[in-house]
A protein has these predicted regions:
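Charged, glycine/proline-rich intrinsically disordered loops and linkers
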Residues: 76-94, 167-176
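Short conserved catalytic/interaction loops centered on acidic-Pro-aromatic/His motifs
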Residues: 121-134, 152-156
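A metal-dependent hydrolase signature that marks the N-terminal structural subdomain at the beginning
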Residues: 1-79, 92-99
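An active-site-proximal "capping" alpha-helix that borders the catalytic cofactor pocket
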Residues: 132-147
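Active-site recognition of the HExxH zinc-binding catalytic motif
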Residues: 108-121, 137
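Short pre-active-site segment immediately N-terminal to the catalytic Zn-binding motif
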Residues: 85-110, 123-129
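Long, well-structured alpha-helical subdomains associated
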Residues: 2, 6, 10, 19, ...
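Hydrophobic (often cysteine-bearing) scaffold residues that line and stabilize catalytic clefts
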Residues: 21, 107, 133
């Protein structure tokens, strides 16, 4: 699985941090069918998103870039139709806990970018039309997040499972204390 995939980490220029790393991405890839990431050649972690871009696919549609983000932030505005902060372990209107940020980066951003590597129309005359665009990439991420989180995954890092009832209960208690 994915031994051929190259990982690089760029220098951070500010207080932004990489919330996930190579091992996190490898765990996600290990849970997916090989065919879904056969085009993937590299995953880069860089600081070029300026906290506005979470990730992107390079022009050749073979590399994914995950961008550094501030240590604490709220991502409510980044969510699209059908997604809630609670589905990642965060509370609406508040800064997201580190675990929720990591879940979002792996099971939303990374899967979304992997969705862009999927061929949508093999007969298309251009790369722009050949590969999945935003709607299909979002659907890909949503479908695979639901599949992967539908059953508990035995791993010591809770980022690889949906938020537990205990985790969500603590969020509710924190909201009441604020």
């Amino acid at each position: 699985m994915g031994a051929r995939i190259k990982f690089t980490v760029g220098r951070l220029r500010t207080d932004r941090v990489h919330h996930v790393g190579e091992e996190d991405v490898r765990v996600v890839l290990s849970r997916l069918p090989d065919a879904l990431y056969q085009r993937l050649r590299a995953v880069h972690f860089n600081d070029r998103g300026r906290a506005r871009t979470f990730g992107y696919v390079t022009r050749g549609r073979r590399e994914i870039v995950l961008c550094a983000l501030p240590p604490r932030m709220g991502l409510g505005r980044a969510l699209v139709h059908g997604e809630t902060p609670e589905s990642f372990g965060a509370k609406r209107g508040a800064k997201w806990p580190r675990l929720a940020l990591r879940r979002f980066m792996l099971y939303d951003v990374f899967l979304h970018e992997l969705g862009h590597l999927q061929i949508a129309d093999a007969m298309a005359s251009s790369d722009r039309l050949r590969f999945a665009r935003e709607k299909l990439a979002h659907e890909f991420a949503t479908e695979w997040r639901h599949r992967l989180w539908s059953e508990r995954f035995d791993h010591e890092d809770p980022v690889h499972n949906r938020p537990s009832a205990d985790e969500l209960e603590k969020l509710g208690a924190m909201a009441g204390a604020v």
